[in-house]
């Protein structure tokens, strides 16, 4: 075997490697561990293994009973199928056997791509930096110093050669493992840097500031967090090169994020095929000023529902109908949606609903907005708001009883002795209930209902406890329990209705009619209850809910007609339960309105088709001598002489779809768009009407879920433009840029 030329280190100069083996470019120095060449050959701490050759410590290798010095230079031009051809010399591979006991550990830490181990006298090893040649302690005998200090030398730019900013490196710390690891027989590829997006990227001050602004927006952090000492110290420990910014700078970054996301949303709105409905929420402040938030809801080309906040505007008089109308008009102009508005949903007090409706219709009509069917559907009241309002009315009617029950539960929960005594009495009286007594959260009426419901089962226990414990004197009277029973009876209707709405995976407008008509029917019957206590409670609820029903039953009914499982049949059935002999009159109102609405959509469709035909008339003119021209005239005459049936009539006359559990109404309309091209446009807009202000998946029981909300003092102190940027950008950042993609089985998260 010819002796290769020598050098200080083992170098392989490779031009080509065939059969899946690794190519090493240029004069790449192989001086560290964990490098496999040709799938068999490995250089590890000056030990070379060929094939399955035996490893020998030091710088020698036993190869077919010959000792070969490793510190030699081998020029390799070609490697074919594992056999080697040496440039100028002949190198013959010989199959060897390797005792498994002689296998050594491979080093896995990425720092070894920057350091070389040097053997020192006395069995000491030191790690030498490949760039600055500075050495560091590594091992002394069996004691190993680890790699943390080596990693700091590179990552913190302690190396003099890394002082130049262009040469600074960032090690992928997530991949750092223990210094040593067990070796394995399989082929291991040479480690190279692979960018994962940030680990090896150069530091970018502007990008970091933008991400910091997004963090502040998404998590409601104050702008002055950038000047807080703890925050600056934390950031400095993560990235010393980050230049600390002030409040004005981060505020500018927030506005930049807002503008970029607004442009993305503008693009989304330009692709919306139908109309857009708005929700309007009032925000109060500790000052005399107020804010209103506007959110747009729509269905996209793929029949998926979306809601996006569009404005958070300061108004001088938020409860003024003129201020609301002006703000809405300004928003529509800013977003180029003046011709796309369909409905507006409010959570205002019902007593002012008519005033708001009339003012908005008149104001926006004067602005020549295209309002459908003379504004009959234009202003919608929030269903969640009416549920909360009615529930609070019921709770207020039994406020004194609730106080006694709360105090009773506090007494029982005050000590384990009281709890044991209460449980003992319940056992003696053989109370079958397994409910647990617990205090309510006063701002969430559902917890009050559940508290009353549990206490109702233990009314005898409370009475017995009062007779045997002189310290307890809060037991409600028999009449009080009667009031609680009546309150729970009717609160259960509201509770179940709210749960049904929240449980809907896709709360389109059609599902609200089912809940509303059942409540209206139950309360209408309850006001004639023979028990005066039940009758009194029902009357309180009916007065409030009946006003909502009169204001919104038309839009609710039209929405359910767009459900192919019910159509007009459910309207006819429910109205017969509510209005009895006068049902036909109210059914006709719905029927007339839905035909009028369809007629407007059909007229708009014909106008668009006429314009399209005019623009393309030259392209469709038949050539001279068309033998089927007379046939076309014949078909036209037949069509005009025979009465045609509209898409709406065809839809209503067809059989109802089965009421299956997982019926997807939006998917059904998507599949039937070709069959009902005009009616599907109408269905798209109607089903997108936001009947509730509460986000999908959120609780509607909280007092803050509906009605006016309070803006905290900090945000009230900010400039109105900054407040709007913070609120809107937080909503927009939840979604991918310039897209309306969302799961088709659930309504996307709405503005909270």
Curated annotation (Swiss-Prot):
Keywords (A to Z) from UniProt: DNA-binding, Metal-binding, Nucleus, Transcription, Transcription regulation, Zinc, Zinc-finger
GO molecular function: DNA binding; protein dimerization activity; zinc ion binding
Chain positions recorded as Zn(2+) binding sites: 129, 132, 153, 159
GO biological process, one term: post-embryonic development
Subcellular location: Nucleus
Start-end of BED-type zinc fingers: 106-166
UniProt cross-references to SUPFAM superfamilies, sorted A to Z: beta-beta-alpha zinc fingers, Ribonuclease H-like
Pfam families with a match to the protein in the record: Dimer_Tnp_hAT (PF05699), hAT-like_RNase-H (PF14372), zf-BED (PF02892)
Record carries keyword Metal-binding: yes
Domain of life: Eukaryota
Region of interest (HATC (Hobo-Ac-Tam3) domain), residue spans: 647-733
Entry-linked SMART domains: ZnF_BED
GO cellular component: nucleus
Annotated function: Transposase-like protein that is essential for plant growth and development. May regulate global gene expression by recruiting other cellular factors.
Subunit composition and interactions: Homodimer.
Record-given protein name: Zinc finger BED domain-containing protein RICESLEEPER 3
UniProt source species: Oryza sativa subsp. japonica (Rice)
């Amino acid at each position: 075997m010819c002796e290769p030329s020598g050098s200080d280190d083992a170098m392989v100069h490779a031009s080509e490697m065939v059969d899946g083996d690794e190519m090493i470019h240029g004069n790449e120095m192989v001086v560290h561990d964990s490098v496999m060449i040709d799938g068999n050959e490995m250089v590890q701490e000056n030990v070379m293994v060929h094939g399955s050759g035996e490893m020998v410590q030091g710088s020698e290798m036993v190869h077919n009973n010959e000792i070969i010095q490793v510190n030699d230079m081998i020029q390799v031009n070609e490697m074919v199928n594992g056999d080697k051809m040496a440039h100028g010399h002949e190198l013959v591979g010989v199959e060897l056997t390797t005792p498994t006991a002689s296998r050594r550990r491979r080093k896995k830490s990425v720092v070894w791509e920057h350091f070389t181990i040097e053997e020192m006298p006395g069995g000491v090893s030191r790690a030498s930096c490949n760039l600055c040649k500075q050495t560091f302690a590594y091992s002394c005998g069996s004691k190993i110093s680890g790699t943390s200090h080596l990693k700091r030398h590179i990552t913190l730019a302690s190396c003099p050669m890394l002082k130049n900013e262009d040469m600074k490196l960032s090690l992928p710390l997530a991949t750092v493992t223990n210094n040593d690891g067990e070796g394995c027989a399989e082929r291991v590829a040479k480690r190279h840097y692979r960018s994962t997006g940030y680990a090896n990227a150069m530091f970018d001050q502007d990008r970091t500031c933008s991400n910091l602004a997004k963090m502040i927006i998404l998590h409601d952090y104050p702008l002055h967090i950038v000047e807080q000492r703890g925050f600056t110290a934390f950031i400095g420990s993560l990235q010393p090169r980050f230049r600390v910014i002030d409040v004005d700078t981060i505020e500018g970054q927030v506005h930049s994020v807002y503008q970029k996301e607004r442009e993305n949303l503008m693009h989304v709105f330009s692709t919306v095929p139908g109309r857009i409905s708005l929700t309007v929420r009032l925000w109060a402040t500790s000052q005399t000023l107020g804010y209103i938030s506007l959110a747009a809801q729509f269905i996209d080309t793929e029949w998926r529902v979306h809601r996006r906040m569009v404005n958070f505007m300061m108004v001088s008089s938020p409860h003024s109908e003129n201020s609301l109308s002006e703000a809405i008009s300004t928003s529509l102009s800013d977003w180029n949606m003046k011709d796309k508005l369909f409905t507006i949903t409010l959570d205002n007090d019902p007593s002012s609903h008519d005033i708001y409706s009339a003012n908005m219709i008149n104001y926006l009509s004067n602005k020549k907005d295209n309002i459908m069917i003379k504004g009959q559907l234009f202003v919608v009241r929030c269903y969640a708001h009416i549920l909360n309002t009615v529930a609070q009315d019921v709770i207020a009617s039994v406020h004194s009883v609730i106080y006694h029950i709360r105090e009773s539960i506090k007494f029982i929960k005050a000590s384990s002795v009281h709890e044991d005594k209460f449980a003992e009495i319940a056992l003696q009286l053989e109370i079958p209930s397994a409910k647990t007594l617990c205090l309510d959260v006063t701002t969430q009426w559902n917890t009050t209902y559940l508290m009353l419901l549990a206490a109702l089962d233990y009314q005898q226990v409370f009475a017995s406890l009062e007779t045997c414990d002189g310290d307890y004197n809060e037991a409600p009277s028999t009449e009080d329990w009667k009031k609680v029973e009546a309150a729970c009876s009717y609160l259960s209707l509201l509770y179940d209705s709210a749960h049904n709405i929240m449980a809907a995976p896709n709360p389109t407008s059609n599902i609200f009619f089912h809940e509303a008509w059942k409540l209206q029917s139950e309360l209408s019957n309850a006001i004639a209850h023979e028990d005066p206590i039940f009758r009194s409670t029902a009357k309180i609820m009916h007065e409030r809910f009946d006003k909502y029903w009169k204001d919104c039953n038309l839009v609710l009914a039209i929405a359910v007609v767009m459900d192919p499982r019910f159509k007009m049949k459910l309207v006819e059935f429910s109205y017969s339960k509510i209005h009895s002999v006068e049902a036909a009159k109210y059914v006709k109102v719905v029927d007339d309105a839905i035909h009028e609405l369809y007629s407007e959509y059909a007229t708009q469709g014909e106008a668009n088709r006429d314009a399209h035909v005019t623009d393309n008339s030259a392209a469709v003119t038949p050539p001279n001598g068309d033998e089927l021209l007379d046939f076309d005239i014949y078909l036209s005459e037949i069509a005009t002489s025979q009465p045609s049936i509209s898409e709406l009539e065809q839809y209503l006359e067809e059989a109802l779809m089965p009421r299956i559990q997982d019926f997807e109404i939006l998917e059904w309309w998507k599949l039937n768009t070709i069959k009902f091209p005009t009616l599907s446009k109408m269905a798209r807009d109607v089903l997108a009407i936001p009947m509730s202000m509460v986000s999908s998946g959120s609780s509607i029981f909280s007092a803050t879920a509906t009605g006016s909300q309070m803006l905290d003092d900090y945000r009230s102190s900010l400039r109105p433009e900054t407040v709007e940027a913070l609120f809107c950008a937080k909503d927009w950042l939840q979604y991918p840029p310039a897209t309306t993609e969302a799961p088709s089985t659930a309504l996307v998260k709405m503005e909270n």
